[in-house]
Swiss-Prot record:
NCBIfam families: rsmG_gidB
Native organism: Leuconostoc mesenteroides subsp. mesenteroides (strain ATCC 8293 / DSM 20343 / BCRC 11652 / CCM 1803 / JCM 6124 / NCDO 523 / NBRC 100496 / NCIMB 8023 / NCTC 12954 / NRRL B-1118 / 37Y)
SUPFAM superfamilies: S-adenosyl-L-methionine-dependent methyltransferases (SSF53335)
Family matches, as PANTHER family: S-ADENOSYL-L-METHIONINE-DEPENDENT METHYLTRANSFERASES SUPERFAMILY PROTEIN
A GO cellular component annotation in the UniProt record: cytosol
Region (Disordered): 218-239
Protein name per its UniProtKB record: Ribosomal RNA small subunit methyltransferase G
Molecular function terms from GO: rRNA (guanine-N7-)-methyltransferase activity
Membrane-crossing segments per the record: none
Length: 239
């Protein structure tokens, strides 16, 4: 996917980028590739692949959750890594307020460099594990949206994310081909953590790769014991 393809595909989906935003994506790509030479950020480094599989893919969630485009919503991105999906969303929709969480200091330093270089505001970067931060009153049940892009199966992701979502907010699940079965397997965990599946969307990227976006509504407060201590959700998922 070239720059032009990226701009055109987004335009077809109702997302129009300004010249400044196009430049910000270009600079983001340059920083990603340069830093990736000494910090493990991504296995995807070809420009056309980064634009498709990181930038475009990150923005697909706003095609199905329209409020991300136009409101000053708050979004927390768990295990953000190199900033996906939250930084592409922030670049495309500047009013969105984002919080990025990652456990690796080197990645946090990279994210700060991107935020500073692109002169982004309304961004907080938190170094730590979701299980610890999810028990912090500053962050707990304080966000309109939480997302995590393919960092674990849905039953585990739910424990990482739903404690951050306020009642009436949403957990946005972004997944590849195994998503539907994961959602079925994760129903008990979602319910126990206060979530309820609202909708599931299946679509393909411009290259034909299948993707799922699942929208989980936060209906009730998450019990205080969740998230459990660091490492437990992945070792002993709620089932």
């Amino acid at each position: 996917m070239t720059n032009e393809d990226f701009i055109e595909a987004l335009s077809s989906a109702g997302i129009t980028l300004t010249t400044q935003q196009v430049r910000q994506f270009e600079r983001y790509y340059e920083l990603l590739v340069a830093t990736n030479e000494h910090v493990n950020l991504t296995a995807i480094t070809e420009k056309k692949d980064v634009y498709l599989k990181h930038f475009y893919d990150s923005l697909t969630v706003a095609m199905y959750e329209q409020k991300l485009k136009s409101s000053e919503s708050t979004l927390i991105d768990i295990g953000t890594g190199a900033g996906f999906p939250s930084l592409p969303l922030k670049i495309a929709f500047p009013d969105l307020k984002i919080t990025m969480v990652d456990a690796l200091k080197k990645r946090v330093n990279f994210l700060q460099e991107v935020v500073d270089t692109l002169d982004l505001t309304g961004v907080e970067i938190v170094h730590g594990r979701a299980e610890d931060i999810g028990q912090n009153p500053k962050y707990r049940e304080n966000f309109d949206y939480a997302t995590a892009r393919a960092v674990a199966r849905t039953s585990v992701l739910a424990e990482y994310t739903l404690p951050f979502v306020k009642i009436g907010g949403r957990f946005l699940v972004m997944k590849g081909s195994a998503a539907h079965q994961e959602l079925l397997d994760g129903q008990k965990a979602l319910a126990m953590l206060g979530g309820q599946v609202n909708e599931e969307f299946v679509f393909t990227l411009p290259n034909g790769d299948q993707r799922y976006i699942q929208i989980v509504d936060k209906k009730t407060k998450t019990p205080k014991k969740y998230p459990r201590q660091a490492g437990t959700p992945s070792k002993k998922p709620i089932s």
